[in-house]
Amino acid sequence: MGFENIWFSHPRKYGQGSRSCRSCANKHGIIRKYGLNICRQCFREYASDIGFKKLD
């Protein structure tokens, strides 16, 4: 039994481990609202490109 078989043998169908950022593959701080599926760091970087505007 190799290393890969031990740690990644459990199916990841739901929960935090099943989702990752679509631009950087990070698993922490995912924004799923409106189907974005990007982490909060990438959201700050790409928010204006996506069409979000900062309100004062």
Swiss-Prot record:
Positions contributing to Zn(2+) binding: C21, C24, C39, C42
Subunit record text: Component of the 40S small ribosomal subunit.
Q: Does the keyword Ribonucleoprotein apply?
A: yes
**Family statement:** Belongs to the universal ribosomal protein uS14 family.
Which cofactor(s) are needed, names only?
A: Zn(2+)
Is the ATP-binding keyword given for this protein? no
Query: InterPro entries from the entry?
Result: Ribosomal_uS14, Ribosomal_uS14_CS, RIbosomal_uS14_euk_arc, Ribosomal_uS14_sf
Question: Which Gene Ontology cellular component terms are annotated?
Answer: cytosolic small ribosomal subunit; ribosome; rough endoplasmic reticulum
GO annotations under biological process? Answer: cytoplasmic translation
Q: Which domain of life is it from?
A: Eukaryota
Protein name according to UniProt: Small ribosomal subunit protein uS14
Localization terms from the record: Cytoplasm, Cytosol; Cytoplasm; Rough endoplasmic reticulum
Spell out the PROSITE patterns in the cross-references: RIBOSOMAL_S14 (PS00527)
Alphabetized GO MF terms: structural constituent of ribosome; zinc ion binding
Looking up Pfam families in the UniProt record yields: Ribosomal_S14
Q: Which UniProt keywords apply?
A: Cytoplasm, Endoplasmic reticulum, Metal-binding, Ribonucleoprotein, Ribosomal protein, Zinc
Entry note: cofactor: Binds 1 zinc ion per subunit.
Q: Where is the signal peptide?
A: none
Principal subcellular localisation of the protein: cytoplasm
The gene from which this protein is expressed is RpS29
